[in-house]
C-alpha cells in the first residue's frame, strides 16, 4: 500500500506558526505517492536540503523534484523514476486531507539561506526544525 504525502513550499513570514497547516501560504507543491514516512522521505529531504544551496524557492522546489525523481545510480548513470512524484498546481487545493498520510512543509526566506521543515501526520505536527535535525531524528 502506498504511503502518500504532499510536499509544500512556503515563504517564511513573521508571525506564521510552523506547527499549523497553512495551505494558503503554498507556492509550489509536490505529490509523493510512495514511501512518505519521516524515516524514508523525511530523512531524504533532510539530507538533501542540508547540503545544497538554492537561488530561490523555485530553484529549491525544482531541486527537490530532481532529487526525488532520481532513484538509482549505477556506474555514474542515474535512472529517473517514472511516476510516483508529481508537480501539482497548489491553486487546485480544495481539501487535500483524506488521502495523504503525511504533509511536509518546506519553509524558506526568499534567499533560501535558512530552511525549516514541518512534518504532519494528518493534523498532528510530528516535527518542526532545520533539515539536519529532521535527518538525525528519523535515521535508523
What does each model-found stretch correspond to?
Residues 3, 27, 100:
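Residues that flank catalytic or metal-binding motifs in active/ligand-binding sites
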Residues 4-9:
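Short beta-strand scaffold segments in enzyme catalytic cores
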Residues 10-15, 107-111:
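Short acidic-glycine loop/turn motifs at beta-strand connectors
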Residues 15-63:
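Short, flexible N-terminal segments of the mature chain
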Residues 46-140:
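Low-complexity intrinsically disordered segments
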Amino acid at each position: 500500500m502506498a504511503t502518500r504525502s504532499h510536499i509544500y513550499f512556503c515563504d517564511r513570514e513573521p508571525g506564521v506558526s510552523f506547527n499549523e497547516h497553512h495551505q494558503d501560504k503554498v507556492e509550489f507543491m509536490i505529490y509523493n505517492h510512495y514511501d512518505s514516512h519521516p524515516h524514508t522521505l523525511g530523512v531524504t529531504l533532510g539530507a538533501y536540503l542540508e547540503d545544497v544551496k538554492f537561488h530561490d524557492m523555485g530553484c529549491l522546489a525544482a531541486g527537490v523534484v530532481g532529487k526525488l525523481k532520481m532513484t538509482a545510480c549505477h556506474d555514474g548513470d542515474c535512472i529517473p523514476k517514472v511516476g510516483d512524484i508529481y508537480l501539482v498546481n497548489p491553486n487546485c487545493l480544495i481539501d487535500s486531507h483524506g488521502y495523504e498520510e503525511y504533509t511536509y512543509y518546506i519553509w524558506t526566506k526568499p534567499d533560501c539561506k535558512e530552511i525549516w521543515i514541518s512534518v504532519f501526520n494528518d493534523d498532528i505536527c510530528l516535527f518542526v526544525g532545520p533539515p539536519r535535525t529532521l535527518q538525525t531524528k528519523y535515521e535508523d
